[in-house]
């Protein structure tokens, strides 16, 4: 419904813009979750993603865990929550504390019957922010740039022509190509030709 002259149109536009930003953050967060899940699978983990936990008798669930993964060889059990938020630290602390408390309650039941460690390693994976903080909500804090750098340092050791990442891990396979072929090899490789001195819009 169109807004009126009383300013409701501006409010409608603001709501629309806020919804679009929220949808964008959700989509990008899902992308980060998928990349993280692919990395863990590549490194030998059993991975569960977007896991609903705490089913209520009245319907619904207590919440959702982004990624839970277990390495059967090392017995490393990890719960990762990904976020692209730009919230103040106080709000982040409260939110991740609740997420990780939920994880400690429900993660062990996701791998019932398996030999699990006594403690769940919990990680907050954030893209935006900075400082010297190393923990959040009771879990370890890892920044996306550091996470990507770690992946690239490993992927540079496996050549695409000799040890290609499986096509079932498309995001990680793209990173492997970028790790080995990031330097331009001449204009013959340009799909879209750019005039000399031109900048990409």
Give, region by region, the residue ranges found by the protein language model.
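Intrinsically disordered, low-complexity Ser/Thr/Pro/Gly-rich regulatory segments
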Residues: 6-201
């Amino acid at each position: 419904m169109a807004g009126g002259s009383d300013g409701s149109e501006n409010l409608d536009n603001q709501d629309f813009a806020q919804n679009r930003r929220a949808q964008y953050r959700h989509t990008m967060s899902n992308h980060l979750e998928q990349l993280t899940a692919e990395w863990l699978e590549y490194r030998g983990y059993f991975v569960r993603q977007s896991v609903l936990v705490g089913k209520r008798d009245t319907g619904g669930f207590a919440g959702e865990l982004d990624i839970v993964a277990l390495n059967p060889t090392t017995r490393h059990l990890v719960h990762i929550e990904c976020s692209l938020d730009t919230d103040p630290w106080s709000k982040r602390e409260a939110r991740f504390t609740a997420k990780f408390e939920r994880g400690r309650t429900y993660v062990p039941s996701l791998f019932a019957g398996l030999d699990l460690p006594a403690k769940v390693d919990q990680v907050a994976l954030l893209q935006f922010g900075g400082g010297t903080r190393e923990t959040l909500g009771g879990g370890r804090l890892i920044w996306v740039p550091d996470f990507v750098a770690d992946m690239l340092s490993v992927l540079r050791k496996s050549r695409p022509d000799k040890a290609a990442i499986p096509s079932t891990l498309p995001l990680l396979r793209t990173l492997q190509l970028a790790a080995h072929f990031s330097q331009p090899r001449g204009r013959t490789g340009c799909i879209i030709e750019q005039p000399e001195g031109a900048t990409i819009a």
